Amino acid sequence: MKQLRYIALLIFIITACAAYSQRMYDRCGSMIGRYENGRIYDRTGCYVGRIESGRFYDHTGWYLGCENGDRYYDRSGTLVGYCSGKRYYDRTGYYIGSVENGYVYDRTGTRIGQYSKVPSQVVALVYLFELFELP
């Protein structure tokens, strides 16, 4: 279950155009994954999933969910969260964090991660740390 959550985390946090090569880091500066040409890799370089037209799949092709504008849905079509500007909320409207100047902050303002070369459409790491209850 934790592996599935980790894969889902990587799939959802790195949503952007295929032209970008992106890297995501945890609060300690360790790389947790990268996105390249529509494919997502974990920290060891293993392929874990892909993004096609706003839809997210794991490495086996299993559909995990999608984005539609600033809203994010799980595979059943249930809204799981949304963003407004640089602030992220769960499906109930509870504030869970923000993204600013390449850094990701939790709801208390504590920096929990960072990213590089990520365009503005990226889904915040903080949103997924909260959603998937990862440390």
Locations of the language-model features?
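Repetitive helical segments and hydrophobic/amphipathic motifs
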Residues: 11-14
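Long terminal segments
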Residues: 2-6, 17-38, 43-46, 53, ...
